[in-house]
Amino acid sequence: MNFIITTRDFSNDDSVLRAAEMRDNVAGSISKAYKGTVRAEGKKKLLLKHLPVPPGGCSRRNSNLFVFCTERDYRKFHQGIAQLKRAPAELDPHEIQQVTASIRCRLQPSLREPPTPADELQTAVSRVCALFNQLVFTAQLRHYCEHQDKVVSYARDELTKRCGEKSALGVEVHQLVALLPHERHRELCHVLIGLLHQTPHMWARSIRLIGHLRHYLQNSFLHLLMNSGLDIAQVFDGCYHSEAYRMLFQIGHTDSVSAALELSHGAAAGPPEADENNDEGEEDDDELRHSDPAPLHESKKPRNARRPRTRVPPHEQKPEENEEEEEELFPSCKATAAFLRAEPSVSNDDGNGGERCDTLATALRHRADEEDGPLASQTAVRVAATPSPSVTPALTPVTSPITPLCI
């Protein structure tokens, strides 16, 4: 006989269950709207319907597309894509997978135990941003490396795995949506769930839409972090503080960044102004009005008064040294490109081909001058400078008549 044991919750407080059901209903209704749209273009238009128009219009194609990343971070991985596009190398897909997995964001996940609701929100936003940046990098691989068959097939499979409700990004998005109050952030929930239903073809072709999404997600996530009471100086890396304060100033959080702006402009500010009720301050102002103006900065002086520039001859110019060397993301592509750029060169066994050739030409010239005169010395130099037939890959036949030498 089979016994079925059932449990029942006898508590009278069911607010938690109602909130969970409401969140599931909201996410389910949004997903149902996208699943009911068959064409990929219709899903894209439905997503654009809930995206506000950015203040600067459409983003540029070469702009930063990573969420909460600096321009240097984005340029590093974008140069890796250009490296794959240039070098026709037999690249292992495992190498691309390692580079993709190393993409993160400058928002740090919370490590506090036990975590508070603000810490859980910070960790969820950080994971969503990192997975979104990895998806953008894979979409750029598919978009720019069209002539690399292996890269195209790898990027197509990765886009299929990374977009969807059952992907890693989909799991993190649903966890983040569960933490948000839907009444206040309904548009953000719609955009987060809507980007999960976009097709791999949309991610590979709509680069400008990715820039639109990046701009909206950054502003919305900053609103969430500031409203939850988190400090920008603690949740972001040090190299991203200035960018975070700039975005906060643009979206209207001027009160939160007033202290940072005062610190940044404190060094450039002049002496403190005198009090309005102080007569000495007024006298100082009168003296300043009647005194001679301060000398102009060198950059603001008239062009005729500037010091003339001295031009350095080309042979005396020093080559510019690169302060930062570009990091190669794919070493195999670098080795292949170096092999293709290599040119055949004439070298001797001792490794000093140039010095040996110069020494031989000098000896033949002196010997010819002593014996037969300057004409023979020119012939000797010409013979010494000619490479040997064993080293030269192909010799062009001489069609001009040979003038005999009279000795």
Curated annotation (Swiss-Prot):
Residue ranges with Basic residues bias: 302-312
GO cellular component: host cell nucleus
Repressor among keywords: no
Biased composition, class Acidic residues, residue ranges: 273-286
Basic and acidic residues: compositionally biased ranges: 287-301
This protein's record includes keyword Ribonucleoprotein: no
Segments forming a coiled coil: none
Region Disordered, annotated ranges: 267-330, 388-407
Compartments where found: Host nucleus
Keyword set, alphabetical order: Host nucleus
Function: Acts as a transcriptional repressor of the US3 gene expression through a specific DNA sequence named the transcriptional repressive element (tre).
Family: Belongs to the HHV-5 UL34 protein family.
Name the record gives this protein: Transcriptional regulator UL34
Gene: UL34
